[in-house]
Structure formats: C-alpha cells, structure tokens
Amino acid sequence: LQRRVPRANLYQTNFINREYCNYGRDFRECYLLFGGSSNERIYFANQVLNSHDSFDISFSEKVEFSYENFECKHANKLFFSHHSFDCVESYYLIDCRNCMNCFGCVGLVNKQYYIFNQPYTKEEYEKFIVSNDTGSFENHKENLAKLQKLNLTMPHRYARIYKSVNSDGDDLFEARNTHNSFSSLLTEDSKYLFYCKNGVKDCYDTSFQGFNSELLYEIAHGFGGSNGAFGIRNFNNQDSRYNEECHDCVNLFGCEGLRKKQYCILNKQYSKEEYENVKNKIIKDMMERGEYGEFFPIKLSPFAYNETIAQEYFPLTKEESLSKNYEWKDDENRNYKIDIKTENIPDKIQEINENILNKVIACEHEGGCKEQCTEAFKIVPEELKFYKRMNLSLPRLCPNCRHFQRIRQRNPLKLWHRTCMCEKENHFHGAGKCEVEFETSYAPERPEIIYCEKCYQQEIY
C-alpha cells in the first residue's frame, strides 16, 4: 500500500521564491531550510520559527540578522552562540540571558559590555571588537577555543528547564508533569517527547508533534489529533492506528495518504460495524505475532539509515548499520573539480571578492566524517553579502558538516542520575558538598561543572 499510494514530494505551504526547502509553511526567499514557519531569507537552517535574515541556525525562534546559532530565541545580531535568549549584538555566547554587546561569555544574565565574562567600559569593548576583527577565520578559531576553555570553568544548571512544574529532561519550556523529554514547549502529563510544541498533552514516545495534540503514542511528526498511535506525518486525526500521511480523518487503521475519511482499513471503506469487527480481528492477529503495539519496522522506511536524522543523534558506520540489517546509502562519486582548498582561502572576509562565487570549495572534512559531508560546496551571492555586511569569516565546512557541528551543541537525548557538584560554603547547603540529586543530560564523565537549581541561582544571579 505504501508503494502504490502517491505521496507528496515535499511538505510546503505558502512558500514564495524558495529553493531546497521542506517541512514548513510561510517561507519567503529561503534557501536550504527544513522545518519551521513564518521565515524570510533564512539560509542553511532547520527547525526555525518566526525569523528573518539569518544563516546557519537550528532550533531557534524569533532570530534576525544572526549567524551560527543553536537553540536561541529573541536574538538580533547574535553570532556563534547557543542556548541564549534575548541577546543583542553579541558573539560567542553560551547560556546567556538578556545580554547586549557581550563577547565570549557563559552564563551571564542582564549584562552589557562583557568580554569572556569580564566587565569593560563601552569604549574598551568597542576597541576590543575592532582589534579582534570578527572577519578573520584565525581569530574565529581562537575565540572558539577561549570560549570552550571558559565554559569548563563556569557552573551549569543541571537542566535547561524554564517555567515548568515537575518535569525533567532538557530544553523544556512551560512543561507540566513532563518527563524524559527534550526541546519541547507547552507540554503536559507526557513522557519521552522530542521537539513537541504548543499544546501536547498525555502523549508518550512522540517527536516533531504539536498544536493541540493529546493521547498520542509512538508518533513521528504531525499536527493536532487525539487518541492516535503508531503514525507518521498525520494531521488532525482521531481514534486511529498505524497510518501515514493521513489528514483530518477519524477511525482509520493501516491507511496511507487519506483525506477526510472515516472507518477505513488499508484504504478500504467500511461501515462502522464492519470497521470495528475487521479492526479487532487484525489487532488480535498482530498481537499473536507480537507485532501490535510496536512502531513501523525500520524495513518500511523509504530512506536508508544514513539519510535520516537518526544518523544525527545515533551515528553508525556503514558496517554497524548493515550488521543491524539497516539500509545504507553509499556516497555518490561526485567527481568535483576543486577550485580552492580551505587553506588557500584568504583569512579575512574583506580580502575575498565576488570571484569566490564561481569557485568550488573543498570542505575541510574532505568526506572523512560521519556527517554526510558533500566534500565540496559553493558560496551563494546572498551568503557572501551577509558575511561582508556582518564582518564574518567565510566558512570552511560544507552546509551538512556545519549543521552537524551545531547539533553537537545539544546534550544527549538521555538522562543520568547525578548529585550537585557545588562545594561553596556561602550557598544554602553550607559547609561541605551539596547533596541535591537530579536527572541531567550531562553524563557523569563529562568535564562541565553541574549545579542543582538552587546553587546555580545563587551563583549566577
């Protein structure tokens, strides 16, 4: 049935003058953007909402004139940052809030004119920005190295959970009774969620779902719906099981690509009584074979393992994939004629002219990574204009490899039980080490300093 029923080649709603975009709505003049809504002139990005004039951003919202951001919100001219909100005209920030004119900072709140977490006058800060020259790639590498070194000296909150009650996971906003979940907003009484937004209630094992969804189980991508299980890309369905790409339907079982239908099994129409009888027989047979209650088997995936986002979060080699009987797509023999290698690119963006637009640039990884490296890439005109306008160095990696560098800034989608590392006597626990326990996405062997909520608040605010 999956092979016979036509599928939409792309999921695009109200797209205007876009190239290489999918899974979104209201995109205007965007390029290589996957996932999101209400975006204009967003390039090389994924899962972006209500943003414009930005490049290389992921899982971000209300961002403008920014570059290389991950999990950032309400930002203007924010560059090379992650998990930072309400920040303006700043560079290299980690876990900062409401900051302006800050450079290379970690864990700051309500600050201005800070450089690597140290305060400066306005004049000193502006002089530093000029002397540092953000358009230099060598300076960029040095700044990143300094930021990572600083990051290991600063305490980190055990989890990025905001305005939430009785919830655990990471990157949660306004969650209530939500557990072992990640990158989600406005969720309630749910567990094992990933990137679920705007009204998800009583849902388990669900990803990329949102907008008033309830009583869902084992769902991969969709909007709305109630009492559904084992589905892919379904919108506003009710009382349904094992369906794919069905919209506005009720009482479906094992259907593909239906619209506004009711009482269908394997795309065949039944009466209400027939539907219940046949459905129950199928469920009984599936249960006897141990199949009912499980998601679609991976052999039904239309894509190879390394073509999906599974490779982003659970990377495998070809040998590992094949040993698990997963399909694998071999790299294409691209035979690019490389015009320029990264070591031959001028260091400063202002030294680069428009001739670069005609060049095939070798990716610095040269295909030797697990990041779907394209081995070479080109700079598009709008991209070069942006780099020059913002004085940012030319990238040395292809868009795919840049994407993988960004998502590495996310902690694993997994929790460990740990104890607060704080030993400061002036905190609420007094002398000795804090004994507060919590669930955190920071693995025990990681080098970061992890604090409980109270110790973190006392240290940062």
Can you describe what each PLM-predicted range is?
Residues 1-461:
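Long, distal/terminal scaffolding or interaction modules
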